Amino acid sequence: MDLQSPNAEWQLSWDVNVMAHVFAARHLVPRMIERGGGYLMNTSSAAGLLNQLGGAAYGTSKHAAIGFGEWLAMTYKHQGIGVSMLCPQAVRTAMTAPPPGADEGSLATNAAAGDGMMEPEELAEIVVEGLAEERFIILTHPEVLEYMRRKTNDYDRWIAGMNRLYRRLLGEA
């Protein structure tokens, strides 16, 4: 998706990646508070921390999902509500499979898979460990933490580097 994507595609990304978490929290948090606490694990993406080449609506909505998770954690921690955000990079699912008849996946999938496609069973083990440790951010690929450090250390350099990668993936550089 890009700037020319229909509004309906942007709305779908927003509804699935942000509003689903809002609706779940509206329903669950009051009940958790009544019980004396609880735990939410929301799924975002490494794109929510780093962004998504070739996927403006996806990357934007995944950033918003992390922002909402942060808000939940900051607002309800004192009431016994824990929050974790799962931020996987490339996991082998139907969503990351190449389109029917295509030799390669999408631009976004190819970029994300550069650090290796993870099997769902590996993801499950990482999630169980992250929840046991009550980590806010649960990363599936350790490289993402280093990418986050690079991004926050020098945003301008990060953006220039990502633009070079984008052009290379498009075959322009």
Model-assigned labels for residue ranges:
Residues 29, 64, 69-77, 82:
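Catalytic Tyr-X3-Lys helix of short-chain dehydrogenase/reductase
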Residues 25, 61:
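Active-site helix of classical SDR
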Residues 51-59, 71:
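Active-site loop-to-helix junction immediately N-terminal to the catalytic Tyr of the SDR YXXXK motif
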Residues 45:
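Residue(s) in the substrate-gating loop at a strand-loop-helix junction
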Residues 1-11, 54-57:
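Conserved mid-core segment of classical short-chain dehydrogenase/reductases
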Residues 74-142:
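SDR active-site lid
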Residues 27-36:
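A short helix-coil junction within the Rossmann-fold of NAD(P)-dependent oxidoreductases
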